Swiss-Prot record:
Heterodimer with DRB1 or DRB5. Interacts with DCL4 and cauliflower mosaic virus (CaMV) transactivator/viroplasmin protein. Interaction with CaMV transactivator/viroplasmin protein inhibits RNA silencing ability of DRB4. It comes from the Eukaryota. Residues 149-188 have a biased composition (Polar residues). Signal peptide: none annotated. It comes from Arabidopsis thaliana (Mouse-ear cress). It is found in: Nucleus. Expressed in roots, leaf vasculature, shoot apical meristem (SAM) and developing anthers. This is Double-stranded RNA-binding protein 4. Residues 4-73, 82-150 form the DRBM domain.
């Protein structure tokens, strides 16, 4: 704590209306490792440090310490006034509140006695009794400064705050998987007239939509972090680049659970995401009916079947090819390099080859 002596020396000069101390330094050593020694001129006297220091600031404080030691026998009370300035400097460096002094008076009016307290760094320090208010505040400031010097109140904040925040973060991380699983899944119903937009609804608000069979409408079910749909559900499933899974119902009739009748296209995406696309196969009936009035078909031309079927029914899509499925609209214009895979009155699927 040798750096306090420069402040004490300056406070003494201000109290007694003296000239401020003047510092001069000398330097030695190489440029990459200089050493400094300072002398200070105060009250007509020059005080010099006896050794060299690695920094100029340390050398100035050493010289000020010698000057303060020479003034202590003459006016010890004048040295004590520096403690108020030191508390203020500490508050400014730490960006904390300035010290707040409160003084109480006791005794007769012709000979009062003053006792001061100072609130600093979140604590209250009491000084000794003095004959004047100024000396009482000096005493309280000295007690506060010595307490900080001894390390009793270096920290003004709660030391347990970082650990409490860490515990909160850990609890949030542990509870996040349960929260994700507890969230209800959502459905996005896309209509042909708005191919680029969808309406997001919760299943809890519309239970009929959740319980409705696949024959009423062809839906796009969007869910996060769900296990992959097995290939025996007769659906067209694909993982998009942002991790969302799209299950597109491809038939309006219940489909028998026969995994050998489903054609799956496995394509590694550019980011390593596996795309599983299950399409209609040759076993599906043509123009099945639900109630005898409306018909819905899943028609695949023979040429398209040859393109989809290979060996055991699995075809690998080379890197750079993308399968796009969107609502069908007669006004849709396919890209020049598009290869149509499937189309009915609701949806159309085609393949793109991108360089």
């Amino acid at each position: 704590m040798d750096h306090v002596y420069k402040g004490q020396l300056q406070a003494y000069a201000l109290q007694h209306n003296l000239e401020l101390p003047v510092y001069a330094n000398e330097r030695e050593g190489p440029p990459h490792a200089p050493r400094f020694r300072c002398n200070v001129t105060f009250c007509g006297q020059t005080f010099q440090s006896s050794e060299f220091f690695p920094t100029l600031k340390s050398a100035e404080h050493a010289a000020a310490k010698i000057a303060v030691a020479s003034l202590t026998p003459q006016s010890p009370e004048g040295i004590d006034v520096a403690y108020k300035n030191l508390l203020q400097e500490i508050a400014q460096k730490e960006s904390s509140l300035l010290p707040f002094y409160a003084t109480a008076t006791s005794g007769p009016s012709h000979a009062p006695t003053f006792t001061s307290t100072v609130e600093f760094a979140g604590k209250v320090f009491s000084g000794e009794e003095a004959k004047t208010k100024k000396l009482a505040e000096m005493s309280a400031a000295k007690v506060a400064f010595m307490s900080i010097k001894n390390g009793n109140s270096n920290q003004t904040g709660s030391p347990t705050l970082p650990s409490e925040r860490q515990e909160d973060v850990n609890s949030n991380v542990k509870s996040s998987p349960q929260e994700i699983h507890s969230q209800p899944s959502s459905k996005v119903v896309m209509t042909p007239d708005t191919p680029s937009k969808g309406i997001k609804v919760n299943e809890d608000e519309f239970p009929d939509l959740h319980d409705a069979p696949a024959s009423n409408a062809k839906e796009i079910n969007v869910a996060l972090n769900e296990p992959e749909n097995p290939t025996n559900d007769g659906t067209l499933s694909a993982l998009t680049t942002d991790g969302m899974k799209m299950n597109i119902a491809s038939s309006s009739l219940p489909i028998p659970h026969n995994p050998t009748n489903v054609i799956t296209l496995n394509a590694p995406a550019a980011n390593g995401i596996k795309r599983n696309i299950a399409a209609c196969s040759s076993w599906m009936p043509q123009n099945p009916t639900n109630d005898g009035s409306e018909t819905s078909s899943c028609v695949v031309d023979e040429s398209e079947k040859k393109k989809l079927i290979m060996g055991t029914g699995h075809l690998s899509i080379p890197t750079g090819q993308h399968v796009v499925c969107r609502p069908w609209n007669p006004e849709i214009t396919l890209p020049q390099d598009a290869e149509m895979l499937f189309r009915d009155d609701k949806f159309i699927a085609y393949r793109l080859v991108k360089p």
